[in-house]
Amino acid sequence: RDSDMVVPGRTMDWKEDPQSNLYLFPRGVQRRGAISDNTIQWTSKYGSVVTAGYDIGTCDGMNEKGLVANLLFLTESSYFRPDDNRPVMGLSIWTQYVLDNFATVDEAVAELSKEVFRIDDPDLPNGAKSTLHLSISDASGNSAIFEYLNGNLVIHEGRECQVMTNSPTYDKQLTLNDYWQQIGGLVMLPGTNRASDRFVRASFYIHAIPQTSNFREAVAGVFSVMRNVSVPLG
């Protein structure tokens, strides 16, 4: 990004076709967090365009205020707390809840940090565990990452939170990235398709590409980073 333009990027490095469909949602949609009496309900403040995974839930999207949300796999995610009676939020609609209700990262962090609901995480249609974490960014360039670890929500917020991949957890990704920063990206970068290696490469290249106010050049630069960290299907 430069001072006036923010260009987010997303690669879908899933092992199979997630049967994605695009949906355009208007403002004023009434929603509920789960098929349960003990859930939260809301009416969407903002319209959004989203991508559905397996056509059962929102995994990525952007709302009319420029808030972008992306849901990625994280093996370490654990939502369970003993004797938890908070209202239920289905993992499949968590991303949509954020897009419906918040215009900025600051707003989302302020509300989600209250932890007023618990996450319900049924298995994915292919049998995989739905262990996921969420990243968001807004039109100002601010970003945040949300990870449920041992039943507690851990939030990382700031303009420096520009890259998220998969395992390990974000704090450990930063530690690994610090090591490679000492070596220097022009000397050597890790080249495997492991999430930690892709995190390091993306973190280096997102700062190495030209920081420009030209929209076409900026988009091309982000795509070049995405190609470098994409994993072939299969």
What residue spans do the PLM features occupy?
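Peripheral peptide segments
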Residues: 61, 74-75, 150-152, 207
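A contiguous strand-loop segment
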Residues: 1-86, 119
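Catalytic cofactor-binding cores of redox enzymes
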Residues: 114-152
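C-terminus-biased signal that marks the final domain/tail of proteins
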Residues: 1-7, 120-122, 129-131, 139-141, ...
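Proteins synthesized as precursors that undergo proteolytic processing into mature forms
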Residues: 85-122, 208-211, 215-226
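Short acidic-glycine loop/turn motifs at beta-strand connectors
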Residues: 2-5, 63-65, 138-141, 147-152, ...
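Generic beta-strand structural signal
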Residues: 58-60, 65-67, 95, 132-134, ...
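A short, surface-exposed interaction/processing loop segment used at functional sites
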Residues: 15-36, 154-181
